[in-house]
Amino acid sequence: GARLVEAGADVIAISDPSGTGEILGPRFFEEYAVTYLNMLLDGIEDGKTKTIVHICGQMRSVYQQINMVHSNALSFDAIVPMKEARRNLGERVLMGNVSTFALEFGDEEKVASLTKFCVESGSNIISPACGLGTKSPLRNIQAMLKTLKKEQNVKLAP
């Protein structure tokens, strides 16, 4: 992380696709995922660089533990109900979770609907749930941005 900070990174995102609560359960999630994520995150802190931690899978059993992660934002898979995450994580900055599958294979209306739902459910940063498929049509990404602009009255660069 220090090298990324030295290189001028504004944000560092850490993805942990296998450290999910549904696989590890609360005890092992805290012991392994939280402990080692925090070691990484604490090594990045320079007062300016922000951090995002993305974890795949269901989080229901580990909300208490995920709240111990020292990141600026928490990003979740599309299977995590954002309303539930918001209820359990309070004022934490939450990111996501527009379905990556829908962005690649769905239509514009589906993407717009999912984006609106994420906004209404309490996501602070709207983004694809688990990245962007290489064949995601530009029109679907544009639909996500247009919906976000409409829902949050946000000005986006042309």
Each language-model region and where it sits:
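Active-site loop segments of alpha/beta catalytic cores
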Residues: 1-158
